[in-house]
Curated annotation (Swiss-Prot):
Protein's name according to its UniProt entry: Actin maturation protease
Keywords of this entry: Aminopeptidase, Hydrolase, Protease
Protein function: Actin maturation protease that specifically mediates the cleavage of immature acetylated N-terminal actin, thereby contributing to actin maturation.
Active site per UniProt: C82
Region (Disordered): 1-32
Membrane-spanning intervals of the chain: none
Species name: Drosophila melanogaster (Fruit fly)
Region annotated Peptidase C39-like, chain positions: 74-188
Top-level EC class as recorded in UniProt: hydrolase
Gene Ontology biological-process annotations: protein processing
A Pfam family it matches: ACTMAP-like_C
GO molecular function list: cysteine-type aminopeptidase activity; initiator methionyl aminopeptidase activity
Biased composition (Pro residues): 8-17
Amino acid sequence: MSNISSVAPPPPPPPMIVTPSTPATTKERPVGDNITTDECTWACEYPEVQKGCYLSRVCQYTPPKHCQYYSVNSIVQVGPTCGLVALSMLLGGSPTADDLLKDAIDQEYTLNGELFSAQYLFELTRKHMPGPAACQLHVGPLDCKKVKELLKAGGCLLVPYDADVNHAPCVKNGHRAHWALIVGYLVDTQDRFYVLARHGKSRNLAVWPLDTLSQSNENLKEFAQPKGYPDDEFLLPPGGIGGSLGLNERCILVNGLPKQVIHVRWS
């Protein structure tokens, strides 16, 4: 697949500052590093894939038609830095999320690490992308031929979505906005298309239906004070998260990464 060309957009207008409202907290159910099960044994040579499929109840007893991914080290976010952590994971940890945070603050994209603009994260991605790679801001549904073909060709995605209590995609009108890095895909025997994801609130590889992630991405329309940060102020792009500089129906496509795609094999 050829590199994606991109055209620099005009500089965005100054962002808005929003003030805090009400607190809340969530926790992910802890899961051991190793699992002993007769489920998903087709992926036993790929422990992170086996665990991800086991936890998501995907291809429990029957191998998928196809599965491929990049092995990416997880990084747990500190503060509301999910987008910066996702980008740092994509870049192999260099620059670090802390370095990206300093850059984002200098560019006036964020106050505390939050990124409620796909455009802002796209600008950071393009700035720090390694030589042979390219990126593009995608506008529209994720569940489309363009996105599927990019993943099949070894591309990755940076995707905003609403995260449920277990961090899986949900529909909350944007009130639980979060960022994930899509590192691969899986097609089951019923031809359902899944994505393999990393994000800053879990060390486990996540496995989500692409159509569910797409619906979550499409519903990002309203800001709500991020849970766990009741006293912090956050920057919103002009027009809010549902506007043209926001998160709604937007993601970042990346290809040409200098990484080896892992094709999951089974006997």
